[in-house]
């Protein structure tokens, strides 16, 4: 009876989990792509010799900042994880997701929550420095000069934090499925008699 109830709720929860994974995949992949392609080149007047301006061309790219490189790599890894889990959920219908498999999926989901959270927070810190600078460290702000670069970075951060929230929900659902499976197995097991 308990297995029948678990199977009935399992079909609906699998569809919801699949939808959440698709959304998380989309959010993290778009964050990785937007930040990975984030580049802006501007020419500025840096001085004058007489009446002739001296110009220099500067480029702002994501790979100039290690935190943004980590952000792109982490979002790509979480996207790949979600893609594998989606494929496993769609094409692995004949596989039984019990025991070690559910545990490994739950652990991988938690690791990916940690990874994407760390990457999004590191990138948010660097975005804050880029927007406002740091007078104590004498770091100048750049968003007043590279507005498009900063706007694209902000969009990538929004997508990444949406991915963090979705991965938290997915991780909670994975743990819930694991707990349900353990509860179902413990209620169907015959009680042992201790003399």
UniProtKB/Swiss-Prot annotation:
UniProt entry tagged with the keyword Metal-binding:
no
Q: Which GO terms describe its cellular component?
A: plasma membrane
Q: Where in the cell is it found?
A: Cell membrane
Domain of life (superkingdom): Eukaryota
Residues that span the membrane, as ranges: 16-36, 68-88, 105-125, 155-175
Query: What membrane topology does the annotation report for this chain?
Result: Multi-pass membrane protein
Side of membrane Cytoplasmic, spans: 1-15, 89-104, 176-195
What does the UniProt keyword field contain? Cell membrane, Membrane, Transmembrane, Transmembrane helix
Transmembrane helix in keyword set: yes
The UniProt entry, under InterPro entries, shows: CASP/CASPL (IPR006459), CASP_dom (IPR006702), CASPL (IPR044173)
Question: Which Pfam families does the UniProt entry name for this protein?
Answer: CASP_dom
Which ranges does the record list as Extracellular topological domains? Answer: 37-67, 126-154
Q: Tell me how this protein assembles.
A: Homodimer and heterodimers.
The family line of this record is:
Belongs to the Casparian strip membrane proteins (CASP) family.
Question: Which PANTHER family does the record cross-reference, listed alphabetically?
Answer: CASP-LIKE PROTEIN 1U1
Protein name, UniProt field:
CASP-like protein 1B1
Q: Which organism is it from?
A: Arabidopsis lyrata subsp. lyrata
